[in-house]
Amino acid sequence: MITAATWLSIEYMLPATLGAALGQCEVRECEVPQSSRPITPYAILFIGDESLQMSIQELGNIIRHRINVIIFIINSHGYTIERAIHGRHQEYNDIASWRHVQALSFFGNDEDHAKRNTFAATTWEELESVLDLVRKSDGVRLVEVFMGREDNQGALLDLLKN
């Protein structure tokens, strides 16, 4: 397990997941990237929409190397933690809205695979049904989970109240 908390760098997680998955494959002597089947070991990534925008190009490498990964995009429409710390209504904490469901095909994944392995969830029920589909698939899987702009807990929630 790796975490961005070590470096406090939001753009760290997608490239780190690529590196960890490639390393895991090398240790386990997985299929070579030219194979028609994805690499067997897999990684699971939870990444915010703002962090993804800073390192999205690595999705192309994940697809190119046929990394078996499940990517959960936590879409809170911007810098949620920064809103709590530096001002909930500051415009610089907002980001452009992307069509994440098109990301796999945009970065070169097979169109049929992209359609079968791209999901969105706005409710717990939708997320539960998506999880069943994700478990039955392989290759790159992308799940966009929509959250509220100020969906915080604990001390961060207290900061928003002040």
Where are these regions (language model features)?
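Thiamine diphosphate
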Residues: 1-162
